[in-house]
Amino acid sequence: MTSHAPDPVHQFEISRLINISVGNMDLSFTNVSFFIIATVVATSVFLFISSSSRGLVPTRMQSISEIAYEFVASTLRESCGVQGMQFFPLVFSLFTFILVANFIGLFPYFYTITSQIMITFSLAMLVILTVVGYGFRKHGIGFLKLFVPSGVPVVILPLVTMIEVISFFSRPISLSLRLFANMLAGHITLKVFSGFIVSMIELGIMGVGGSILPLIMTVAITALEFLVAFLQAYVFTVLTCMYLNDAVHPGH
């Protein structure tokens, strides 16, 4: 029996579900669109159900939502102070959206929207545009002090300022690439190991014995991917709070 090895990249392909075009614009409803909506709906339903509980003893869902709430609130307060709480809806929405999207992508035949650079870059740009918009609205031209560190000798000030500007505008790139690359690499690794298991089993009795180690590795990597799914949402949230601090307190 001959079989073709599964393509580990095929799972990231964007496919049209409903063809929609307006003039020369392709506005088709794709699998990415579907899972974006599914992520928003799943997150909203979970938060609605968990916040509807009125019992004296919190349910498991209520405890999870309270932990998420306290994590975002405490991270914002530590990074930006009390003023940072005005960004709570944004940061909490980003955290829950990324976390749920990452978890949904771990289920077989489900799509991982955070493995698409266009999704992660859009989320990162939302953060940076919020920082720039709020910074100029709150501080005016004083927001530019962010790029002029205090205590720097005048001789090297232009060089340091240029480095600060480059560093600032590279933030959406690093923020989006970190999430995208981790989710992409993890799912490719899982696909490779699972494909190897299927190929070994197709060889018969001898292949079944040889598939035990890859199976153990697949289970271990799957468990690790659940941890990575949380850690990536955690890191994105912490960095978002740090960047928002620059908008609240632009002076070094």
UniProtKB/Swiss-Prot annotation:
Pfam families: ATP-synt_A. It is found in: Cell inner membrane. GO terms for molecular function: proton-transporting ATP synthase activity, rotational mechanism. Keywords: ATP synthesis, Cell inner membrane, Cell membrane, CF(0), Hydrogen ion transport, Ion transport, Membrane, Transmembrane, Transmembrane helix, Transport. It is a multi-pass membrane protein. Belongs to the ATPase A chain family. Key component of the proton channel; it plays a direct role in the translocation of protons across the membrane. This is ATP synthase subunit a. It comes from Bartonella quintana (strain Toulouse) (Rochalimaea quintana).
